[in-house]
Amino acid sequence: MKRRNFLKAGTGAAGLLGGALSPSLASAMAAARPKLVDTAPVEAISKGKPQHWLGPAFWGNRLQDWQSNQGRLECLQGGKSFEVRTAALLTRTLNNAHKPARIRARVGLLTPGSTGFCGFLLGVGAGKLEYRGAALAQRSSGQNGGFMALLNTEGELSFRDFSSPENTLAFTKIEREGSVGIDQIGDREIQLDCHIDPIDKGRFDVRLIASDINSGKEFGFAVYNDVPAEILRGGISLVSSPNSDEDGARWWFSAVESGGEKIDIHPEHGLGQVMGCMHSLNCAPEEPVLKLSAQFMPIDTTALPAARLEYRNENNKTWVTGADAPIGDGYVAAFRIVGWDAQRDHQYRIVDPGTGQSLYEGTIHRDPGNQSPLKIALYSCIIPTAKSLDETEFKNHIPEERVLGRYTEDNIFFPHTKLVTHCDSHQPDLYVFAGDQYYETFPTRYGRDTPQAKLDTLYRWYLWYWTFRDSVRNRPAIVLVDDHDVLQGNLWGNKGDATGGPREEDGGFKHDIDLVKMVYRIQSSHTPDAYDPTPIQHGIPVTYAHFVYGGTSFAMVEDRKFKSAPDYEANRLTVKGELLGRRQEQFLRDWAEMDPGLPKICLTASIWGSPQTDEEGNGLIDYDANCYPPDGRTRAVKLVEDAKALVLAGDQHLGLVARQYSGDFPVDQEQASGALFFSGPASAAFWQRWFEGFGKLENQYGDDPNTGNFTDPFGNNMRVLATANPKITHADFSDDNTSWGKFVSDRELKSEGYGIAVVDHAAGHYRLECWPWDADPQRDRQFTGWPQVHPIESLQQS
């Protein structure tokens, strides 16, 4: 039926837009509709036991809000303030073709008697978000959010806006040409069928039809006419929701199907049972060791309790069975192989031991040795969104910030495509993630003290993994656990002793110890063996370690696990305490004697000092920065100085190079004494720090006014050699700041990105690079002050 006749029939019967049409007329109109688009299943939903992995084609927001159960996707969250729970269709996207499309599913209520709605969310991102970013849409409407085609518990079929940046939980009904309701849903099972039909002038009509699942008889429908093409592009999600600001309905879905040329199908976008793998190689000459972890999705581990690692070298067609490992807490299988042949490339795969099916594959490259420069990528501090998607109103922290569209790249950073692509273009040999792989309130609210805390943490972790899975699939990665990784804003680990009180500053780990142990399991199962694996209190594992890779000797240390709780009453210049703790201090003494003749690099979470200033250039007191306690910090700096090591770190959200001293400034100001630290910039963070010297500091480096000799408020001396300050000055920020913190959401006001450290054995120097996230290394410039070249002091010593 042509649109003009369809409209004529509708208005003749109802008389008014939005009026109900008679069932007999609805049937007549249905018979006159154009030929239906054929559909095919999006994904066969598991008929097994409940699991929070919904299958390769679906991504649930959040993990704990959905499960697959005996052939259905079931929403588990219908509480107040949990509107619009979504399950994104990862493998389906609305394209810009002027062609028909169709999406259908069987739906039903899990909570008869409650109120709410279900249906389809269409056009997330308006075709401007990468499919993974579009998959995060949930709760609140906002720019480029699309619209929803819905059935509510009263049987009303409607279309509701999901693109308004104001009153974001209103979900305003869109005026439509006609509809027929189907009465209360109750315990009925309904076929919900959404048709997208092209009409004149590049526009579309969208029909939502409710039918009997057995006979196919239509119960009712709604029509949204003359839909602009630009809002019918982007992501597609299933929706289950209570009414706004109420406890309410939870829905189930099954037999989800799609069809039509307006829907692109991308099976490669699916997420299988394995999210990814990470590995490390310790190529110490006595006994090379491979460690590899396979991160599974939240699967039913009674159906797949274990995984197998198989591998083969470049000259062998036969797969070798490495080991079987249980899929343990955090859905991780951990493997360790002693005597690894590090001189050959190997393919690896993760296999289901029961069926022999390969679940995930990658490459373990040979040790690059010292025949070519070793390239190290340095990341830290990364959030998936500029603002939490649970915030119903986005407010600027300062007037200079742009208004961020909720479902635009200004707010949805994930999956950080430019950042990752630009860093990977350097072809790093080793990836170092220096901590804060996720944060407690991004992309959603706190979940750390809820019964679903583990799943909530995994939701954040999976977003990090999904970002970097292809980077680390074929290259070794070192991951350091920092404070936000264990869901604390600050951490004074105090060897695990939390008896001082409930506050973070009382010391110890403040959240469920089993959750903390899971964090170390998911992030550290693949890292080199601990130097002394004796756990701290409560059985919390340690991860400080030594390894050799790329002709370089590495030490990993944990600079918060043993750190003393702050004593705010004591004199901050003379207070005594631990930073690394005696065990790690002894480790660094031992490391200084290991691997003679190799470059030495120490990997740690945070720079051991507090190079940060206020609006006038005065040092800021920050007990969280590892300037405290000063005596523990001084011992730590002296140990890496004695080892002639370069230190790579993150945490401070401020790209910086500094020479740190364990005592007074050297008499010869140009002498390369002290320990060299490179703290990479945040990859994407909300809290900002500055180091502004205003040209007033002695011994500036390269005539940069933001460099020179600096003594922090704890008496620690350092020479700052480069800084990547935010693009807005501290003074301008403070003049207009409306919050208690130093929050900036607009990336255009920040200096974020990644670091590259190159170990050039032949030239005998380190090359330190610091890149903006959006800079193309083939044509763009680094942050001011980089690159820097410094001698490999351990080679000079040998």
List where the protein language model places each region.
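Carbohydrate-binding surfaces in secreted/extracellular proteins
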Residues: A105, D183-V223
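Secretory/extracellular carbohydrate-interaction modules
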Residues: Q77-N167
